[in-house]
């Protein structure tokens, strides 16, 4: 009888500790309202979005999704667990992992006497399918909503996907899959275990399906959070190869199982292309570190192995091509998104985006000068001149557009004193001269 009493006492104490941990977690979950500048319509406009986040330190550091705060937030307000609203600023943003960090206005927090409760990370590496988890957030504006489910998969892989605004995400991590309900507004909120430890950051649901939600593992979030707080960005190296899983191809390439990874494509003009790598090569090792990409879930660690090297460093890629194995020295560049800086040239009725190096390579452009037209206002001078969405603006008044500042200055001059402006454009590889008239 005494043993039973002891066991019951231990169980009650454990449940109480778990309850305290979960209640503390609830105090750390916040709602995020963002007002963001957008340029897609050929003019400046403001959009509003709502998401969730979680306080990760008592000095006001909030972890959320990159797609919640966007790239051009002009106002961020965070609603705390006490329902009070506090201003915040963007500290850092990493669309590659869909994570962002905010910092609360701590002067305001202290002036108003608020006490902040910080959440703690759990070990996502130790999760197992069937384990109970909870998603906490603000679905459809309903604050501090808790939904319960299980871990459906601990290592879900998605091929490189395009997020909101066309930004790439998913190259450098796998995802936790859960059947806990994740709806619009949950994004950025924590996925937690029963003791309130954060094991993931809710990121997306699966359109048209039920009980399919996905979260960024804490193992990824912990590293990105630290880098964003310290440096404001996560800088990664790039060589220009896209790895592909070798599953079912080993016999074709006469390879032993679990040997190497397929080079499925090579970006034109990239360091790998300049070094001589080709699609169909088998990458065996990177600086002597053996790689194994038999399954898609094994690809993110290979991407991270390259991304973690210093920019400008030389990598030795050991490659099998046919019966021959040889080493290729490849010098890394800084990884860059295909989505460049955006701006609105309102008097002309044009929204533009800087041509990035990645965009230029994808579209086989000769260089990375220029700006892509992403929006045109009907009836405005740009539209009347014949400029269309998707055109690339190469020169303005015979000056190469090597940055958006060139276009901004020409537009400012037009705004101050309207005069005909000569624009050199490219459409389907055909270059034309157009005149924007007042």
Label every model-predicted segment.
Residues 20, 48, 66, 89, ...:
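C-terminal recognition in membrane/secretory proteostasis and scaffolding
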Residues 1-9:
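Bacterial N-terminal signal peptides
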Residues 17-21, 111, 119-123, 131-170, ...:
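Flexible, gly/ser-rich surface segments that form the specificity/activation loops bordering the active-site cleft
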Residues 10-44, 48-52, 58-61, 65, ...:
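N-terminal activation segment of mature serine protease catalytic domains
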Residues 28, 40, 46, 105-120, ...:
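Active-site region of chymotrypsin-like
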Residues 32, 74-82, 133-137, 313-321, ...:
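Short conserved beta-strand and strand-loop elements enriched in small hydrophobics
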Residues 37-38, 55-145, 184, 208, ...:
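Conserved active-site neighborhood of the chymotrypsin/trypsin-like protease fold
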Residues 58, 93-97, 154-160, 246-248, ...:
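Short, conserved beta-turn/loop elements at beta-strand boundaries and strand-helix junctions
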